[in-house]
Amino acid sequence: MLSLVQKIIGSRNERFIKKVSRIVQKINSLEPEFEKLSDEQLKAKTFEYRERLANGEILDNLLPEAFATVREAGKRTKNMRHYDVQLIGGIVLHQGKVAEMRTGEGKTLVATLPAYLNALTGDGVHVITVNDYLAKRDAELMSDIYEFLGMSVGVIVADLNPQQRKEAYACDITYGTNNEFGFDYLRDNMAYEKEQQVQRSRNYVIIDEVDSILIDEARTPLIISGASDDSSEMYNLFNRLVPYLEKQEKEEVENEQEQRDFYVDEKSKNAYLTEKGYAKIENMLKKEGILEEDDNLYSPHNITKMHYLNACLRAHSLYQLNIDYIVRDQEIVIIDESTGRAMPGRRWSDGLHQAIEAKEGVKINAENQTMASITFQNFFKLYNKIAGMTGTADTEAFELHSIYGLEVIIIPTNKPMIRKDHHDEIYGSVREKFDAIVEDIKERISKGQPVLVGTASIEASEVLSTLLKKKKIRHNVLNAKQHEKEASIIAMAGYPGNVTIATNMAGRGTDIILGGNLEVEIAQLEDPTPEDIAQIKAEWLKRNEAVKKAGGLCIIGSERHDSRRIDNQLRGRAARQGDPGESKFYLSMDDNLLRIFASQSMAERVKKGLKGGESLAFGFMSKVISKAQGKVESYHFDIRKNLLEYDNVVNTQRKVIYEQRQSFLEAEDVSDILADIRIDVAEQLFHDYVPAGSMHELWDLEGLEKALKSDFMIELDLQKLYQEDDSLGEEDLKKLVREAIEIEFVEKTKNLDSGAVRQFEKFSLLQSLDTHWREHLSSIDHLRNSINLRGYAQKDPKNEYKKEAFELFSTMLDNFKYEVISSLAKIRIATEEETQRAQQEWQESMSDIKAEHESVIDNNQRHDEDEQEETPKVQQVRREGPKVKRNDPCPCGSGKKYKQCHGKVE
């Protein structure tokens, strides 16, 4: 029924394309008029549009003329004319949607249309790419168009200093990576002077490879952190002990003889000790002198030991060299599971990275304390309008819409796509599969057809490379180990008979041109003459035609990825802009996707039915594979959705803190803010000792006097005052306390330079807020890590998390207010020079902070899905009863007052 309706009225996508085609016709009708304009007249259009906006006209009304202006500027500066389908893509992006455009359809040029239009407002436009190379390349390629029209262009890359960043953000259009934009946002919210902040408003963002950034990267938060205590000895110890543990093949075993020390869950990348394993590791720790004879790992004080043990167990049993990571320059470098790229600077959390460092025998870096963090999901939601481009978004359309409110529109290709997609071939073993791939490659290159082989891991690419070398087949390898050669390898990938092996081609960002990249060849010539260029072009045309006759670029996939989208990205490298091309995937029943997610009975039947070297290639198996991929995609979507629900709690708190902090930073004078805080603190302190509406017998005036003296340097004999006048009520005493705190501050500052006082007050506010926020993030991390254990008490972990996170936040705000007023009361107010020196010292003390796109994919999976984890990673003392007063004994049992123990601010 649905298909019948769609045939009659067309799909939603078709109706949208038909609707915007009318706008395209309007733009096309303006082309002859704009062609007649002189350069000066065309440039003047920018000023005209800005004036019209200032007079109340809206961007939608300006769109046809603005797009016609950019198209004409492209023709004059780059000899590039925007196709009609590119105009459609530009309209989609302006409307805050995702444009799915096939590889080679010119997404970089498309972005100039909405970027120019939205930059007319003066609020800036951000264009996000997946790496620094693409950010620089795209900005340089398109800067001629923008600058011709009077628009400034900036680029944010990793090695810029703060002043250069500020200048780049001040430009009309700023290119950069998602990491750099996100980290600059976090750093701006750690600045101590307004002038140190580099970003301005987050108005409109265009995200290239939007599916990669908003979906693949969604589970990996940006984290700014500082080093915590060194624990390398413990990691080295457990790294030495874990190899003695034996792996159990499955979770449940039929008899005790089959029981081993641990088992793994490959779906969630977790490893679990059995009871036998616990006993074995306990005995080893006792022999090492780490555990006492009567001690056990279940004791609360051994929680940290379990942390090291679990991290090392996972490092040894689940993470493999050259698949999950590589060792480069004596450092562990994570490999992105989606793109195959090495990601220097990114670290796994929860001690996993340190465990792998111990495993590989490199220096163990200290675990880090989070100082600021945000997920891409919540960072990009800060923009007024989001748009995205990609070659493969349709399979993720539901997630993009449900989480980000982004509609996916499939843009028609400029020329018909004529790629031939062959059925998958499935073999019984990995070796048989690789042998078949080598034979296929040999046959194709014999007729001059270039081949791109996509692999899922470095290990697979190196195995295949070894087999090709044995057959004396020349080839290039592109993986995380050869990333420096990427551009030159891709430039040659379309040569007749060339073979290129690439680990996960997703996000490579460079088109493979049949016959080779002509522009690269010309650029490599030194002072070429017109004759040299003409000869190069003629040779390229011959090669281009030869490759087309051979069938175009052939894509061979060595296995299916977990995500159909990644497979489609690999396929999409062939048959660009109407060129011929082919694609084919080779699989084995030992591939991870089929081994983990296909049923065991299915795998056994297929293996039995295949004799040595035989393969299956029919539609039924394609359905099995598609179903397995659907399971994985659904599984990962649930993880991302779950993570977002948890992170939204912290995100709400982050917004409150950052807005409050920004108001402190922008205020010339924070004395009114402090006056309000002093009132809150006086109220808080008073009711800690005099419960609201209570009888006199419950008042602790002596405790209140001691707190005033120790925390605020105030001598106030409340007991004497009450004895002299027992008509004094609760409100009267509260007023006395409030006035005493206010008078003390006025007396302390009345003879000091007001400028120095104001500067010191602002510094104290910012420093105290940062300290408390950092400690709060640590508490939230601990809460998040252990909250799933609430399931044992028949409580919903998510609701418990929201409730307790709110309580922690409220307590943090109370403590912040109390400590900042207490500190100002006890500290001598510094001179302006001393304050500046203190600010400098504080910032120098934070100079070791690291900006990391911390890979918590697998660790968050563990927290989100494993409701049955037996041992919490941390133990946190948490209030179950009435609020603990600052002078009460700390609930942890240390014997100290709460304010000097867990209520203390370092």
UniProtKB/Swiss-Prot annotation:
Cofactor(s) it depends on: Zn(2+)
Cross-referenced Pfam families: P-loop_SecA, SEC-C, SecA_DEAD, SecA_PP_bind, SecA_SW
Binding site for ATP: Q86, G104, E105, G106, K107, T108, D511
E.C. designation(s): 7.4.2.8
Cofactor annotation remark: May bind 1 zinc ion per subunit.
Biased composition regions of type Basic residues, renumbered to the chain: 896-906
Membrane topology of this protein: Peripheral membrane protein
SMART domains associated with the record: SecA_DEAD, SecA_PP_bind
Top-level EC class as recorded in UniProt: translocase
Catalytic activity: ATP + H2O + cellular proteinSide 1 = ADP + phosphate + cellular proteinSide 2
Compartments where found: Cell inner membrane; Cytoplasm
An example Gene Ontology molecular-function term: protein-exporting ATPase activity
Protein transport listed as a keyword: yes
GO biological process: intracellular protein transmembrane transport; protein import; protein targeting; protein transport by the Sec complex
UniProt biased composition (Basic and acidic residues): 853-865, 877-888
Disordered, as annotated region: 853-906
InterPro entries linked: Helicase_ATP-bd, Helicase_C-like, P-loop_NTPase, SEC_C_motif, SecA, SecA_CS, SecA_DEAD, SecA_motor_DEAD
HAMAP family in the record: SecA
Function as written in the Swiss-Prot or TrEMBL entry: Part of the Sec protein translocase complex. Interacts with the SecYEG preprotein conducting channel. Has a central role in coupling the hydrolysis of ATP to the transfer of proteins into and across the cell membrane, serving both as a receptor for the preprotein-SecB complex and as an ATP-driven molecular motor driving the stepwise translocation of polypeptide chains across the membrane.
Family in the record: Belongs to the SecA family.
Protein's UniProt name: Protein translocase subunit SecA
Organism of this sequence: Francisella tularensis subsp. novicida (strain U112)
Classification lineage: Bacteria, Pseudomonadati, Pseudomonadota, Gammaproteobacteria, Thiotrichales
